Every structure is written in C-alpha cells, then in structure tokens.
C-alpha cells in the first residue's frame, strides 16, 4: 500500500489510548477540543463528524467496528447510514478470538449492495480492525510465523500481568505474537483491497491506513498502552493512497497528527474542511494535508507541535515536536528527549536546562490558551453512564476496575 501511495514517517496520535484518539480521527479535533478524555464521556451532539459531513455531501456511509471503545454509546454512529457493532455486541468479551475476517466480510457485503443500487453513491467506509489489540493471539499459521522455535509458557494473553523482570526470550515471543497479529490483519486487508480491484473501485478510492496508538514492550518500564506518552505508544503508521492525486512512493518526513486525517480526506474529495466546524479561534486546529500529498510543498507549514494537555500517561503531560519531546511529570520535574528513532527517547535533559525551559514555556502557553478557550464557551463532552455490557467489556480488557 505504501509503495502505491504516500507514507508519513512521523504520524502522532493525540493520546496513548483508543477513545480520545478515535474521536480525534473522526472529528479533526484535538482531545482538548472534543473533551472525550475519559471512559464516561461521549461526543457532544454539537460537534460535526467526518461521516456527517460526507453524508451531507451525498455519500453513502458505513462503519464496522469490533472494540468496546468504538461502541455507539460514545456517539460514533452519528452520520453513518449503517454502524455495525455486531462484533462487540452485548455478551461478547470483545477481545477474544479473531474478528478481522468477519469485519471485512461485513464491509464487503455492504459495498456489494451499494454497487447494485439503481443510482450508486460515492461511499465512505470506516473499518476498525481490532485483532492487533491485545490479547496477542493470532490464528495459525501467524501464531508461529515469527517465532516458530518458542517452547515457553507465555501465550500473549493477559499481558497486563507480565512484569519487566520477565525473561528476554519470553518478551521476544510476545513481540513475535504482536507481529503475527499485524501480519494476519495485513492479509485480511489484502482481501478487501482485492475486492475493490475486482469491482473497479481501487484506483478511484481514497484509502487511509492508520492506528489510534502503539504498544509498549518495556522500553520505558511498562507493557501495553495508556501508561506513557513515549513514541512507542503514540507514534502510529499513516499511509494514504489515491492515484488521481498522490504520486506512488511519496514519503513525508514532517510530523503530522491524527487530527489532520479528517480534513485531509475532505481536501482530497474536494470538500472544504471548514465543514468540520472547528472554531477559528481554537488554540490548536486541524490541518488539511492534501496540498502536500498533491506535491505542493510550498503550501504553508505543517504544524510542528502535538500537545498532550489532558494528563495522559500516569499524570504526565507533554508536547512533541519534530526533534524533541517535553514530558512534565509534576510541577517540579521535567524531561526533554531527543526523538530521533535510533536514540529510543533515552537521552534526556532534566531540570533547568535551557532547552527544557524553552519548550516548557511553549507547553505552559498552550495550556493557558486551552483553559482560556474552554472558559469562553468551548463545547463540553457530556457525561454518560456506562451500560452493564460495556462496563463488563472494559473490565475484561483491564481498562476499568471491577
């Protein structure tokens, strides 16, 4: 896919977990602007979604999901003609077994029906592949694809109970199972892409592949996600393929954000991103990246800043730029990391280093701007009561306490 489209080397999620990142992806708003930062918050009705904008422009719209944080309880279904959450229906554990083949089959069935319509519409489909999420239990042959000789007892389930003291060999196996999940999901996406080719849709469809967060494997002492805002948890893949506008093999090194995806899709489709409704006075706004994808590298600057002002990652807040990241652990302790991949965020300046003070000033200014904007009438995410089935699914994943 990347060889036929554009690959963003440094795409950054606005949070190290599913709920706020997906709301950002589908609204073009930073979590500080949409407010869905906790398990008991849902998307405000006043905030437009990408699906609503596209349906208003005559698109058929459908979503297919398999994770509890994607349930319609949170407001995701707005703007979708069909929002299929059958694979995360009441009574399902939500993270046991495989779901990608059924998701692809459901989407393919919907697309086939749309193609048979008397007057087919352009379509927008949102597909949430869940199998890469833990538990890491890919089906054969993917369970042994990357580590066929392993004879230990670790099986990739209940990874939240694994300790950093586990053997290096066992950890290698966990990573191999994760890689197996990725390869399995890759195969299932290939099935979908082949259908698009067979139907003559492949070369006139905007295809965006990304993720809501990464995974930690004790690079900084934790496993899973939610715990830190180091790059292993927030740097994600982002590939965009659309032959009418994007040269094959394009690689963009600049840092971009998940909040830029929705306006970029609209830009490639010839629709004004202002329809997403973000107030112009908001401290951080979405960016339509379609000019860069079309090869116009003089079309202004790509924002060099991703802020994490909502206490993600164990009470830490921070800001990430193209070359550095500041993490504030508390009012008296800060760290500045070089984010070059080969350094693994292990070289740091602490305390009162000039570099820390300069970036800290940027973070403090952003926090002040956000707080002022919120006081002046920014939309507040409404609270919600978790249904019993949703609560059970989140408990099973270890996201909330029993």
Where are the regions that the model predicts?
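Catalytic domains that recognize anionic headgroups
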Residues: 1-402
């Amino acid at each position: 896919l990347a060889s036929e489209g554009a690959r963003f080397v440094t795409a950054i999620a606005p949070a190290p977990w599913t709920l706020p990142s997906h709301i950002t992806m589908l609204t073009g708003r930073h979590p500080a602007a949409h407010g869905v930062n906790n398990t008991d918050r849902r998307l405000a009705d006043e905030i437009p979604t990408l699906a609503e904008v596209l349906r208003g422009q005559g698109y058929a719209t459908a979503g297919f999901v398999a994770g509890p944080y994607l349930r319609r309880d949170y407001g995701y279904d707005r703007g979708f003609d069909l929002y299929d959450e059958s694979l995360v229906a009441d009574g399902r554990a939500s993270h046991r077994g495989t779901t990608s083949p059924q998701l692809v089959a459901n989407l393919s069935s919907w697309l086939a029906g749309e193609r048979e319509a008397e007057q087919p519409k352009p379509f927008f489909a949102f597909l949430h592949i869940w199998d890469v999420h833990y538990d890491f239990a890919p089906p054969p042959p993917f369970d042994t694809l990357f580590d066929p000789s392993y004879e230990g007892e670790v099986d990739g389930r209940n990874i939240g109970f694994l300790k950093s003291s586990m053997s290096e060999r066992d950890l290698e196996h966990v990573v191999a199972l994760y890689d197996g999940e990725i390869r399995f999901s890759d195969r299932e996406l290939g099935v979908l892409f082949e259908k698009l080719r067979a139907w003559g849709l492949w070369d006139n469809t905007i295809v965006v592949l990304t993720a809501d967060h990464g995974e930690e494997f004790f690079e900084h002492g934790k496993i899973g996600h939610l715990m830190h805002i180091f790059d292993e948890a927030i740097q994600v893949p982002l590939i965009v393929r659309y032959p009418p506008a994007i040269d094959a093999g394009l690689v963009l090194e600049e840092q971009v954000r998940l909040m830029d995806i929705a306006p970029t899709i609209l830009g490639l489709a010839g629709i004004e991103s202002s329809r997403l409704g973000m107030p112009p006075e908001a401290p951080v706004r979405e960016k339509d990246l379609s000019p860069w994808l079309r090869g116009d590298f003089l079309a202004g600057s790509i924002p060099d800043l991703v802020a994490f002002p909502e206490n993600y990652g164990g009470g830490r807040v921070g800001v990430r730029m193209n070359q550095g990241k500041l993490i504030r652990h508390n009012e008296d302790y800060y760290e500045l990391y070089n984010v070059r991949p080969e350094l693994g965020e292990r070289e740091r300046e602490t305390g009162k280093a000039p570099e820390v003070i300069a970036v800290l000033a940027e973070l403090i200014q952003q926090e002040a701007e956000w707080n002022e904007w919120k006081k002046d009438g920014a939309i507040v995410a409404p609270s919600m009561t978790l249904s019993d089935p949703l609560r059970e699914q989140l408990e099973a994943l270890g996201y909330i306490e029993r």
